[in-house]
Amino acid sequence: INDFYSSITELHDEIRKQNRIGNQLIDLLMDNESPKLEFKASLWATYHGVSGKLVEEQEEKNLKLEDSVLKTVAGFLNTDGGTLLIGIKDKPRDSGDKVAEVLGIEPDFKWLKKGKRDPEGYTHVLFELFKNSLTNPVANQHINLDFPVYQGQIICRVDVQPLPRILGQQ
């Protein structure tokens, strides 16, 4: 009976944790972009501007998108930190949309190595990109990745803590 009660308690705690994570994500999706919150449709996959549909025939990574993600993370590191959600379509301020459109990161998986086309492989690639692109060697210690699922789509949540400032530095 004690084992049963213990497992029920653990399950209940996990459900509460998942609900809390889900509620935090919904709050972010309802916000507009700001100096501390950015949405990116993807790391590499291109979407048509007007229709918003995925460009299915794309063979090469869109490195402009990758660069945009890296610049956003660098900006967060060098200011007050922030959250980047990859797999979310930008929500124009005047669109009247209450919640940003969730696209998911799965279209980016096609450029990951076979057997690594999942959040773990995505994590590895992102941290390699950060390590190779960001000039501060401790930058990765200020970045946390999470992969919540919303409406059946995997999102990459990148939480960035600001780098410490040197005394007297603005």
Q: Language-model features: where?
A:
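Conserved N-terminal catalytic/coupling substructures associated with nucleotide/phosphate chemistry
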Residues: 1-170
